[in-house]
């Protein structure tokens, strides 16, 4: 009897369906994640960066020396925002279609073939140092992103400089998010194959039980927000 089967019986899950994962499947899954991780991170970064042009042009339109009308600033800024969001959504869809084949890795119980766990552990050990480095860079960028904003508050009250500081904040957050998403995607894939960290069988089953109530909660919260906002027409406060 394999170790995976013993573990399955020990956890009292013999009646649950278990997906078999061969060495070939594990390697293919890791290759797909390696291919999509950077692209997904880049798309996420584009979403965060998308309003920067709109914000900057809006601030520049308030400055007479830039000779940019509000309509031109809004038109160009919104066009850039839509294009960047469209590119990001396209990337998300392509990556989602590529990884859909193995989406059960995150939510369902799996049983790996002989040698798979050892192979994945070796890859995870080799990736640990780059993972920590990227995570530290990402978190540091996110923490430091508020420095331009508070620095500007300390030395100037100009709206233009404040908007510029917000744009710098978004840029640093985007860079940090890129490193965090990229590194986390690869590490999570290996943890999924090993059923460790956030992907143990117990946590998978707990997440399944919680998914229904969480969805209901957000639907109710959204309905209350929209009803309140439409009723009072006080959108600048209800959010």
Q: Where do the PLM segments sit?
A:
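Hydrophobic alpha-helical bundles in membrane proteins
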Residues: 15-239
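Basic, Lys/Arg-rich alpha-helical nucleic-acid-recognition elements, primarily the DNA-binding modules
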Residues: 1-13
């Amino acid at each position: 009897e394999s170790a995976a089967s013993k573990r399955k019986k020990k956890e009292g899950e013999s009646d649950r369906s278990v997906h078999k994962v061969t060495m070939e499947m594990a390697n293919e899954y890791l290759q797909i994640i390696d291919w999509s991780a950077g692209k997904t991170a880049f798309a996420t970064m584009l979403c965060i960066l998308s309003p920067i042009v709109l914000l900057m042009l809006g601030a520049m339109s308030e400055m007479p020396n830039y000779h940019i009308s509000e309509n031109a600033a809004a038109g160009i800024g919104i066009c850039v925002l839509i294009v960047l969001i469209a590119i990001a959504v396209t990337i998300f869809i392509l990556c989602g279609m590529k990884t859909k084949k193995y989406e059960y890795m995150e939510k369902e119980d799996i049983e790996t073939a002989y040698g798979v766990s050892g192979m994945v552990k070796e890859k995870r050990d080799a990736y640990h140092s780059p993972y920590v480095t990227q995570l530290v860079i990402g978190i540091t960028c996110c923490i430091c992103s508020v420095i331009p904003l508070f620095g500007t508050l300390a030395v100037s009250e100009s709206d233009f400089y404040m908007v510029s500081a917000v744009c710098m904040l978004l840029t640093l957050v985007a860079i940090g998010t890129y490193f965090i998403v990229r590194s986390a995607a690869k590490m999570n894939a290996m943890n999924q194959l090993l059923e460790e960290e956030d992907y143990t069988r117990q946590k998978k089953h707990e997440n399944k039980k919680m998914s229904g109530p969480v969805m209901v909660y957000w639907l109710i919260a959204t309905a209350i927000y929209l009803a309140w906002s439409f009723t009072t027409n006080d959108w600048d406060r209800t959010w």
